[in-house]
């Protein structure tokens, strides 16, 4: 790509007054990043069909000064947030549990049958909260999200997200649920570690919300579950959505609370925050409850940056905290990346769209050939470029 094109597309959005690259410096940075990738993979970043967006914040360990830079950020464009929605869902649940003086050994359960969404017959009525979080962050299971969705209730979730500064965020759909089943949430209770009920929550009917930033129609068609192709752009206005910058700020607020405004800090006690970060960094093979088969659930199974193109164990010095998501050809990763022996701390978020035929729900996406290799290589290239240019 010509330098002028880099200057036009390497765009950073203002964020909390943090230092920004100047235009030419920013363009040079992204040129160096993409030069560190294979030409075939780097080309995807410039292909408008892939809708690539990247946002990076970084600093030297121990510093309070973050710098940031972005590539092709398009904050008003809809994309499938997919399982990245589990990040704020988990943290909102932590707040509610902590507000009642409970810890991760609390048990969340229900006194009503499931309303909708993925909920296998083997799913327990009550589950220890730490186990729910573990299932979310190690292999990104869907039923734990649906458990917390019913626990929190739609209106309470959005009131808190708005108070935190995320008014356009939408947690309005259970995982694998018809769009009409999501405003109502079921009744249940929370027990302490001994099984004593500490508080109950009622069945609730929330406000029906939709995508807040304009139109959410995209693609060429949608294949219904019964195999009928519905031609034309699909309307995703009733799907979950979190802008890339918002999900990164949500992550930043849990990994480094002092670096965000007080109003954006999660109301999570420090001891619980440290426990949650340990869970978020856990690889599937390190999980004790549940135990996962490492042949099926390898380290890169639900982590795309750095290791998503390999089934090998991650390097022991590398630490990845965050959440990824994939659905309908959209791949997103939002991660905090550190490595023993390096003083670089990196918050990296990106997404890519890999759906060549433009048909949603047909399970024909280029995850393996384009998506996973691109995001893994991008993570390594950003890390390498920041280290080599001395921004650590």
What are the functions of these language-model segments?
Residues 74-81, 118-123, 132-135, 143-148, ...:
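Second-shell loop/turn segments in exported
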Residues 25-39, 229-392:
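Structured C-terminal helix/loop/strand segments within mature extracytoplasmic catalytic/sensor domains
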Residues 80-108, 348:
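Active-site SXXK
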Residues 25-77, 381:
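Beta-lactamase-like hydrolase cores
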Residues 26-36, 124-256:
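Active-site-adjacent helix/loop patches that line small-molecule binding or acyl-intermediate pockets
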Residues 86-93, 136, 161, 247, ...:
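Residue-level preference for non-acidic, small/hydrophobic
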Residues 99-126:
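Short, glycine/proline-biased beta-turn/loop segments that scaffold the active-site neighborhood
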Residues 5-24:
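N-terminal export signals
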């Amino acid at each position: 790509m010509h330098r002028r094109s880099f200057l036009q597309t390497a765009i950073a959005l203002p964020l909390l007054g943090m230092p920004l690259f100047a235009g030419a410096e920013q363009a040079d940075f992204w040129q160096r990043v993409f030069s560190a990738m294979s030409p075939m993979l780097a080309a995807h970043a410039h292909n408008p069909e892939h809708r690539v967006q990247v946002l990076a914040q970084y600093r030297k360990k121990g510093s309070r000064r973050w710098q940031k830079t972005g590539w092709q950020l398009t904050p008003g464009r809809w994309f499938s947030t997919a399982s990245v929605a589990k990040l704020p869902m988990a943290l909102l649940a932590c707040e509610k549990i902590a507000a009642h003086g409970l810890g991760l050994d609390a048990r969340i359960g229900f006194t009503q049958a499931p309303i909708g969404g993925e909920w296998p017959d083997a799913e327990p009525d009550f589950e220890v909260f730490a186990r729910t979080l573990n299932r979310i962050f190690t292999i990104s299971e869907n039923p734990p999200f649906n458990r917390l969705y019913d626990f929190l209730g739609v209106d309470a979730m959005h009131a808190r997200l708005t108070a935190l500064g995320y008014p356009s965020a939408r947690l309005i759909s259970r995982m694998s649920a018809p769009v009409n089943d999501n405003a109502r949430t079921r009744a249940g209770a929370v027990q302490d570690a001994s099984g004593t009920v500490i508080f109950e929550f009622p069945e609730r009917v929330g406000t029906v919300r939709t995508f807040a930033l304009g139109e959410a129609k995209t693609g060429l068609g949608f294949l219904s579950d019964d195999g009928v192709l519905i031609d034309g752009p699909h309307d995703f206005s009733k799907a979950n959505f979190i802008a890339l910058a918002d999900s990164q700020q949500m992550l930043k607020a849990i990994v480094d609370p002092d670096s965000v405004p007080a109003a954006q800090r999660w109301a999570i006690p420090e001891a619980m925050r440290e426990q949650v970060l340990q869970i978020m960094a856990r690889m599937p093979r390190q999980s004790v409850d549940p135990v996962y088969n490492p042949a099926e659930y390898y380290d890169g199974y639900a982590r795309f940056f750095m290791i998503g193109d390999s089934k090998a164990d991650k390097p022991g010095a590398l630490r990845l905290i965050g959440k990824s998501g994939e659905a309908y050809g959209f791949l997103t990763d939002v991660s905090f990346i550190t490595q023993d022996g390096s003083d670089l701390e990196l918050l990296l978020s990106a997404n890519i769209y890999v759906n060549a035929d433009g048909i949603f729900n047909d399970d024909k996406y280029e995850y393996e050939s384009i998506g996973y290799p691109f995001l893994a290589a991008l993570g390594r290239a950003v890390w390498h470029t920041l280290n080599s240019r001395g921004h650590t």
